[in-house]
Amino acid sequence: MPFSNSHNALKLRFPAEDEFPDLSAHNNHMAKVLTPELYAELRAKSTPSGFTLDDVIQTGVDNPGHPYIMTVGCVAGDEESYEVFKDLFDPIIEDRHGGYKPSDEHKTDLNPDNLQGGDDLDPNYVLSSRVRTGRSIRGFCLPPHCSRGERRAIEKLAVEALSSLDGDLAGRYYALKSMTEAEQQQLIDDHFLFDKPVSPLLLASGMARDWPDARGIWHNDNKTFLVWVNEEDHLRVISMQKGGNMKEVFTRFCTGLTQIETLFKSKDYEFMWNPHLGYILTCPSNLGTGLRAGVHIKLPNLGKHEKFSEVLKRLRLQKRGTGGVDTAAVGGVFDVSNADRLGFSEVELVQMVVDGVKLLIEMEQRLEQGQAIDDLMPAQK
């Protein structure tokens, strides 16, 4: 756990090979990259806030793999982690983000007018649409490493900023610790609130310390715009609604996000960002846009088809179970979203989802009629 690692200097009394973790049964990005040599080279380093190599990798040591997705196996504890431990992070980022090089520059586009179509995904197949991202506030440690005081300060800042939103974004903040068990569970079941911190990835990285202190959810009155505070990231911004109007969801997302950033700037706070990695977040898998645009989509036939995984791969999409990352699909309903985060703009990623989902629906309709889908197979994007 972070904070117990203040004895990093004491560990250096042991040779690096005595401290090197056993990764022999591991299947995550960190385990693929971390060698005894790299460990020896980086283990004495720490960021200005005291985050060490062992803090970075602990979650990946404790969690060898995941049944549904290839996990990253490491986290950042502050903005400087990506620089101080770049010899570990850079190859992981390149591996996870489709060959994204240390010299590459990220691009941002939060103008919803640049999205082509997206307002007409068939609601007979698309049950709901959602776009989310994360944001980190510069000057604070990230959740694996932040103190109670930092976390409470982030919550206070977030609540002040969010309470200034108006129009259809106006809403209120609900602190986790003042919710009843039933209220919390209802919000989780409705997919509005993050789960209780039972995920081993959250626990092993130290993100669940002091739970539920200074955690909460802010949402507008009709629950189409939500902000999670102090879960895996300082802020998770989510726009969602029933049906297939991804254009509307994305427009609300861009408007709300831009307003939130402006409100933080008015208090002299900015979000962590740099030209190479885009928006800096706790998990390297979310760097860049941090954006996941997803739909819950009914594909009872295509979902069982042998080519389903190949189709998704070619469209640069990924599937999750109905209840999210740790679950299986129920009743032929899948959570389908963009696989990329970094190296593409927000508009490009949402466009991939919109175009890809249209094709998935066309394939599903063919299969309903007992027809072949070979001629619809997409080229690799």
UniProtKB/Swiss-Prot annotation:
Residues 125-367 form the Phosphagen kinase C-terminal domain. It catalyses: creatine + ATP = N-phosphocreatine + ADP + H(+). GO terms for cellular component: cytosol; extracellular exosome; extracellular space; mitochondrion; plasma membrane. ATP binds at residues 128-132, 191, 236, 292, 320-325, 335. Changing residue 292 to H/L/Q: Complete loss of activity. The modification Phosphoserine is found at residues 4, 199, 309. Changing residue 340 to E: No change in activity. SUPFAM superfamilies: Glutamine synthetase/guanido kinase, Guanido kinase N-terminal domain. It is an enzyme of class 2 (transferase). The modification 3'-nitrotyrosine is found at residue 269. Residues 130-138 are annotated as: Internal MTS-like signal. It holds the Pfam family ATP-gua_PtransN. GO terms for biological process: futile creatine cycle; phosphocreatine biosynthetic process; substantia nigra development. Creatine binds at residues 72, 232, 285. The modification Phosphotyrosine is found at residue 125. Residues 96-122 are annotated as: Disordered. It is found in: Cytoplasm, Cytosol; Mitochondrion; Cell membrane. Its main location: cytoplasm. Its EC number is 2.7.3.2. Keywords: ATP-binding, Cell membrane, Cytoplasm, Isopeptide bond, Kinase, Membrane, Mitochondrion, Nitration, Nucleotide-binding, Phosphoprotein, Transferase, Ubl conjugation. Reversibly catalyzes the transfer of phosphate between ATP and various phosphogens (e.g. creatine phosphate). Creatine kinase isoenzymes play a central role in energy transduction in tissues with large, fluctuating energy demands, such as skeletal muscle, heart, brain and spermatozoa. Acts as a key regulator of adaptive thermogenesis as part of the futile creatine cycle: localizes to the mitochondria of thermogenic fat cells and acts by mediating phosphorylation of creatine to initiate a futile cycle of creatine phosphorylation and dephosphorylation. PANTHER family: ARGININE OR CREATINE KINASE, CREATINE KINASE B-TYPE. Dimer of identical or non-identical chains, which can be either B (brain type) or M (muscle type). With MM being the major form in skeletal muscle and myocardium, MB existing in myocardium, and BB existing in many tissues, especially brain. Interacts with SLC12A6 (via C-terminus); the interaction may be required for SLC12A6 potassium-chloride cotransport activity. This is Creatine kinase B-type. It comes from Homo sapiens (Human). The lineage of its organism: Eukaryota, Metazoa, Chordata, Craniata, Vertebrata.
